[in-house]
């Protein structure tokens, strides 16, 4: 029978204590090894709570699935802000650079329907609109158009998907 343990853990800093240790102990798996794998997979989400699913089959094989925090949370973390703007049309709370948008897009890669970096970056920029966050000093919608027009192709040349 397969057992599933779901928990919210601090990115890159999970430990064998609660909630993981007590849940994994009865399943007979190497808790330290599982925690190390979780920390490796969640390293990019340092300082954020990350949803993790640990799947253990009858032969004690362990599979770890890591979810990603919401895009808005990743944007706020990148900017170092607590919340978005209450007046998105008139109040700007931060400005992302194209490399920062690309970093967030790579983090969301597994959770989006887009097939390439540019399309996922446009999704991230779409999240910036109601938050009052600009990208490269311009409104996020304008930056999406600039991205489509190839304005940032030179910056993205070294960005891996």
From Swiss-Prot:
Entry GO MF terms: large ribosomal subunit rRNA binding; structural constituent of ribosome
Gene3D superfamilies per record: Ribosomal protein L11, C-terminal domain, Ribosomal protein L11/L12, N-terminal domain
Top-level taxon of origin: Archaea
Record's keyword terms, sorted: Ribonucleoprotein, Ribosomal protein, RNA-binding, rRNA-binding
InterPro entries recorded: Ribosomal_uL11, Ribosomal_uL11_C, Ribosomal_uL11_C_sf, Ribosomal_uL11_N, Ribosomal_uL11_N_sf
CDD domains listed in its UniProt record: Ribosomal_L11
One biological process term in Gene Ontology: translation
HAMAP family noted in UniProt: Ribosomal_uL11
Function recorded in the entry: Forms part of the ribosomal stalk which helps the ribosome interact with GTP-bound translation factors.
Oligomeric and partner information: Part of the ribosomal stalk of the 50S ribosomal subunit. Interacts with L10 and the large rRNA to form the base of the stalk. L10 forms an elongated spine to which L12 dimers bind in a sequential fashion forming a multimeric L10(L12)X complex.
Protein name in UniProt: Large ribosomal subunit protein uL11
Organism annotation: Methanosarcina mazei (strain ATCC BAA-159 / DSM 3647 / Goe1 / Go1 / JCM 11833 / OCM 88)
